[in-house]
Design a protein with these regions (language model features):
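Blade-level signature of beta-propeller repeat domains, shared across WD40, Kelch, NHL, RCC1
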Residues: 104-133
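Loop/turn-rich, solvent-exposed surfaces of beta-rich toroidal or solenoidal domains
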Residues: 1-98, 102
Length: 133
């Protein structure tokens, strides 16, 4: 299992559209992702790894079994919007695409998709576009 913290703690945003556009660039983005594994002997979830520094503001994470990565879309104060590929076993960043500080890199509750040739089909708040990798 993989979970993200995408609830802004200090900001009360009553309008979903305003929230999805402002959390990150204007309002402080929430951070934190964690991978769990089911322990069949204890019948309970066990944490495999956590990353308190990773932002996943609204886009649905995607797991790639072929690359052994989980992909998240978030906002970084220095670089702006990005997609990070985290190693499924360790949580280490293995892949990163930086979009910059405009909202074109805001996935706004969409799904991260990689094409068969490895290019990213990014479903942005401003519409889908292809990122050649």
């Amino acid at each position: 299992a993989f979970v993200v913290n995408n609830i802004a703690a200090d900001a009360v945003v009553n309008d979903k559209l305003v929230g999805v556009l402002s959390i990150g660039p204007i309002l402080e983005q929430p951070t934190g992702v964690e991978r769990f594994q089911w322990n069949t002997e204890k019948n309970s979830w066990v944490s495999v790894w956590t990353r308190g520094d990773v932002s996943s503001t609204s886009m649905i994470p995607a797991v790639s079994t072929s690359s052994n990565l989980v992909f998240v879309n978030g906002y970084d104060a220095n670089d702006g919007w990005d997609v990070k590929g985290l190693d499924w076993n360790s949580g280490a960043t293995q892949h990163r695409v930086v979009f910059g500080k405009n909202n074109r890199g805001n996935g706004a509750y969409a799904i991260i998709q990689y094409m068969e040739n490895g290019d990213l089909l990014f479903n942005s708040v401003s519409g889908p576009f292809r990122v050649k990798l």
